[in-house]
Amino acid sequence: MTERVLIAGSGVAAVEAVLALRHLAGRGFDIDLLAPSHALEHRPASVAAPFGLGAPPPLDLHELARRYAVGLVDGRLVRVDVEDRQASVVGGRAHHFDHLLVAVGARPVQSIPGALTFRGPADVRAVEWVLAEIARGHRRQIVVTIPPGGTWTLPAYELAIMAASQTSGMPEATVTLVTPEREPLWIFGEAAGQALRELLSERGVELRTEARVAHLTDDVLWLESGEAVKADTVLSLPYLEGPRISGLPCDEEAFIPTDAHGYVMGAPNVLAAGDATTFPVKQGGLATQQADAAAATIANALGAAVDPRPFAPVLRGLLLTGGAPLYLRAELDAQGISRATGHRRLASEASSHALWWPPGKVAGRYLAPYLSTARPVSLGTEPLVDRVPSGSKAHTAEHHAALDLALLLADEDAAAGDLPQALHALDAAAALAGGVLPVAYSERRERWLGELQSRTSATTPGVPT
């Protein structure tokens, strides 16, 4: 009887696991994706949307399922019967599994009452409204905050840097970043901290480190030190809470404990990956690495000639700035990590040149290559690889010139009717810009891709595109 792997979730860890399993173990088993949504949102890139940059469109999971022979099952996992190997969804329906991977993510919750919590695509319009209010002179002071205990702080720096660029020159407009960190993006080490301090200074962002928010009142953000920070607009990152799956163990914050190979403690044949686990750093690239470790473990159990290596986290962060992106990389020690003691950094790099390829926001071994073009590529593409940083520094003017050239080539190719080449040029532009494009070109990419698919359908009837 064919073994069945059930993957619960529709985020980056779940999709990475699908790609990894098919790459490692082929198609001699069934994969079902138990998904509450049939689209993978590019959540990390959504931070750029309020500033006139278009995030890549959501990935259609139906296309992924068709391409890789995956069953797509509606539902949100709420309960696991470990002994009977049954996974139940909202409404009570149960699904059998031989191997279960829980990749359901975490739940973002408001961290500061009265502040605008930026969680992703759903909050883009609210940030756009704030920027419009500042442009009209109705608001002046933006404060971006990071809640205590937050380990993945990079989106706050992106919000502050791009907000400062957008409001530059507006009368009395100020941007302040308040963080409990000792240094900016301290999780990446000294190289990142120094690079961020310089960048924040260049963009005119006031930085307050080792500062914890107490509460927010009318136009004043109060710190635990008693200091008052003027703020008629406060943007905050959320707290994250675990999924609390009935039948599975969890810590006090409802996150699922796992070993280095992804196995859930005390639950044979059940693994977990991504933000749902107790690993303290909640970041897309790390979630894909956990998914890779879990997929290798499952592939080995299915009989594939795979050596299941333990999760060895390498943190890769692409900081969107509105100009040339900043690439950050650090090796983390996966042993003995706790929320109380933090982690030990083993290596730290910061560069204006790509430190991995393809240079996506979510640096997944299989997911990044799959999403690196306008049309998702096959598994024949080489997996993500790290790169040695260039010794030279990319200059903003050179970056903009290269980006403008790529966009011009895309327009010229499209005007000549060569849509495949136009899409290649946009892929190059997106790589230069950290995966995001000006909104107009993001819309053109969707239009050109639709036209190309229509042409293909017309010339090859009966063949799916």
Labelled PLM ranges:
Residues 30-32, 71-87, 95, 167-260, ...:
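A Rossmann-like FAD-binding core segment of flavoenzymes
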Residues 2-70, 149-187:
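Beta1-alpha1 glycine-rich phosphate/pyrophosphate-binding loop at the start
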Residues 2, 70-158, 165-168, 235:
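FAD-binding core/adjacent interface of flavoenzyme oxidoreductases
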Residues 327-393:
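C-terminal auxiliary extensions adjacent to catalytic cores
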Residues 446-465:
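Alpha-helical linker/edge segments of TPR/alpha-solenoid repeat scaffolds
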Residues 111-138, 228-290:
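FAD-site-proximal beta/loop scaffold in flavoenzymes
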Residues 273-321:
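A conserved FAD-binding loop/helix module that cradles the flavin
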Residues 432-436:
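Alpha-helical junction/boundary sensor with strong preference for TPR arrays
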